[in-house]
Amino acid sequence: MSSNSQEDNNKTTEKKNTLTVIDNRTGKSYEIPINHETVKSIDFRAIKEQSIDFGTMIYDPGYYNTAVCKSQITYIDGDRGILEYRGYPIEQLAEKSSFLEVSYLLIYGDLPSKEQSNLWNTKIMNHTFIHENLISMMKSFRYDAHPMGMLISSLSAMSTFYPEANPALAGVDIYKNKQLMNKQIFRILGKLPTIAACAYRHRIGRPYNDPSNTLSYTENFLYMLDRLSESNYKPHPVLTRALDKLFIIHADHELNCSTATMRQIASTLVDPYTACAGSAGALYGPLHGGANEAVLRMLEAIGTIENIPKFIEQVKQKKQRLMGFGHRVYKSYDPRAKILKTVTMEIFALLGKNPLMQIATELERLALSDSYFIERQLYPNVDFYSGIIYKSMGFPTDMFPVLFSIPRAAGWLAHWVEELADPELRIFRPRQIYMGRRNMNYVPMDARQVQQHNSGEKLSSFSSGFDRRRDVSEELFNFEDGAIPKTATGSKSQLSASIEQSFGEKISPQSH
């Protein structure tokens, strides 16, 4: 009897990897499987009030708590401040590896052997030159074109140079050919620094430099940025290594906005150039690729160390924002920020201290000793130091998102490769909750009533000088009968006299 009772107790307390949902509208109970701490949203479709209903959906603005793929690329534990690429701690990779080796790791899953590494480096560096027509296109941009706009446009244009790489032209199954896939990886990783360097040189009005394939990846990038006429120019090794570390820690970060964009666009089976251009477009946004620039503006606004206590009080009072602190994922110190803090000291030892760094260091010290920020788990993130480093290295702020895009392309391509190999791959198709009107009947234009509350806003825009001149002219002249009507600004004679005085000639209705 006791044995039977024990069995009953075991059955009662047996752990089940399921979630039980009770629909209080119907009283029905649903059991949903739990795997890897997740439930499938499609399982909730079975929960219906009536059999003809669509079913229950999960509402999650911004995908804040939604997993859209299974991945083996990057692991993050935000509570403990852990970041790993393919299981390797970011601290070890930043200290011991190189950007190209990390790129290989992200894309192919393992660290390369010496032979694989040599071949990989050679393949990438042999694809650093860009087509002369692409160079001509870049030279056609305005002198003050933003480098990120030039990079996005050039990436997109590259898809037209390689039609054999476009599934829309060459067939949806072309990337079952791994050699063809590898070719596009070599091209994108090889040519991105060249495009970025050309965009930078374009802004400062200097001729573009050809790549030097005898140099390392980041060394070659700095060479293309800074070489003047020297035949043997070589960037300083401290700067090269610092940039390599920056590239390593920016190479991937799980499903951030731009990487999620890569997966969404790539789910259509579009070519990787178009997908990378879309991802770079997402990174261009100030909430993604522009956060480190916002940190610099904050530090410059603080001005001196003496102003920091006042600034911190204003942050607590919600009068100021503390940029570079806190993260959507990390609830402890961002491991990338720890690495960059060391890199910052290396750069300053070579180039001299930046006054902003002194402000940043004191701001961090005071914030991390204040219970207000500790209780809210606000710690420095990667953007807090990256902008200071880039500025100290002499990069203008409009190059910051470009410097983010070059290394992040390795992560984008890793996710592209993984996604195309996923047997569960389907085109992304999020759902919406429709909140608008229904069952409206079409009303002829003459019978419609103007909605006064927004009639002036729907088509409003800033007026250019062209618009203002046209508006005044259309008020002044009646082109149909040649009459010049009175306007709110004055009579015909007053307006005519004003215009005649400005242009020094008589105005007639036919002079237009």
UniProtKB/Swiss-Prot annotation:
List the keywords (alphabetical): Cytoplasm, Transferase, Tricarboxylic acid cycle
Gene3D superfamilies attached to this UniProt entry: Citrate Synthase, domain 1, Cytochrome P450-Terp, domain 2
Compartments (UniProt record): Cytoplasm
Residue positions of the active site: 288, 327, 383
Q: List the pathway annotation.
A: Carbohydrate metabolism; tricarboxylic acid cycle; isocitrate from oxaloacetate: step 1/2
Note the SS bond partners.
none
Reactions performed catalytically: oxaloacetate + acetyl-CoA + H2O = citrate + CoA + H(+)
UniProt GO BP: carbohydrate metabolic process; glyoxylate cycle; tricarboxylic acid cycle
- State the family it belongs to: Belongs to the citrate synthase family.
According to UniProt, the name of this protein is Citrate synthase
- Species the sequence originates in: Dictyostelium discoideum (Social amoeba)
What lineage is on file?
Eukaryota, Amoebozoa, Evosea, Eumycetozoa, Dictyostelia
